[in-house]
């Protein structure tokens, strides 16, 4: 692998999936000048087109890859299994082959949904993944491949990502609440949450952490905000904050329901909380709320 310490003045970082909520946040943030981030669209770099991938690499002399690209529609993944697998697993294989050929590492972004079948409390990086839906299965398969393929690769697991861009639970609830609709919300799924903005702004420090982390065998990081919650509690907070903004009460009912009372195509974990090593992150100037 290239010694990234020698490239500190001019590291070229390829970010796949740059049009997603994290990628767009990353493009908005002014980052360290010594990192040059590339956010190619699918016409110039596509995980399903090896020729375009090779051309882009040769042209831009990439030193590190951050793979944000993923098929993330959990319910639709149960239907479009082939497309989901092509992006989340086969695409990662192609990316890994490209990285290996060019002697660069990959920071693979993954998910709490690699867990699901065992509801045995908060999951640390040593817990064995056991996905309960097809999306989680493809992400777990890509994790295994990334870790086993090269010692230069690192996996970062996020959970229930929310932010300004894209579609996410918080934005959906805001729309329903502002439309004065009563809402039934699941209350028995224990979750962690990751702010897209907090993750994006800390990517330069995560790259610093990456340089050291690849020296160890446990090349997995959990990255979430502090604390745990559930979707019902999150929805109540959203309503409270909206009432403060518009300065009036919102007269709707938010009803707590059980997972068994909600119909969906894909199963969701009852407990996908992630244990985060905040002390390790703080050693690299990553301080999470």
Question: Where are each of the predicted segments found?
Answer:
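NAD(P)H-binding glycine-rich loop region in Rossmannoid oxidoreductase-like domains
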Residues: 50-87, 100
């Amino acid at each position: 692998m290239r010694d990234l310490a020698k490239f500190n003045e001019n590291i070229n970082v390829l970010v796949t999936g740059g049009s997603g909520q994290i990628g767009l946040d990353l493009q908005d943030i002014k980052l360290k000048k010594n990192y040059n981030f590339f956010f190619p669209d699918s016409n110039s770099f596509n995980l399903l087109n090896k020729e375009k991938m090779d051309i882009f690499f040769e042209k831009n002399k990439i030193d590190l890859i951050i793979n944000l690209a993923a098929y993330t529609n959990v319910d639709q993944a149960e239907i479009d299994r082939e497309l989901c697998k092509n992006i989340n697993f086969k695409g990662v294989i192609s990316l890994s082959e490209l990285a290996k050929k060019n002697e660069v590492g990959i920071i693979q972004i993954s998910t709490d949904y690699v867990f699901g079948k065992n509801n045995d409390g908060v999951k640390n990086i040593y817990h064995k993944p056991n996905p309960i839906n097809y999306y989680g299965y493809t992400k777990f398969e890509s994790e295994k491949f990334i870790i086993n393929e090269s010692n230069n690769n690192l996996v970062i697991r996020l959970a229930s990502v929310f932010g300004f861009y894209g579609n996410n639970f918080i934005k959906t609830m805001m729309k329903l609440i502002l439309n004065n609709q009563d809402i039934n919300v699941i209350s028995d799924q224990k979750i962690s949450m990751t702010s897209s903005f907090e993750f994006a702004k800390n990517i330069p420090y995560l790259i610093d952490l990456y340089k050291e982390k690849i020296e160890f065998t446990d090349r997995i990081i959990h990255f979430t905000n502090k604390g745990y919650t559930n979707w019902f509690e999150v929805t109540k907070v959203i309503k409270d904050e909206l009432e403060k903004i518009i300065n009036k009460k919102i007269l709707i009912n938010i009803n707590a329901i059980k997972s068994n009372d909600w119909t969906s195509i894909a199963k969701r974990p009852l407990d996908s909380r992630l244990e985060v090593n905040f002390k390790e992150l703080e050693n690299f100037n990553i301080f999470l709320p």
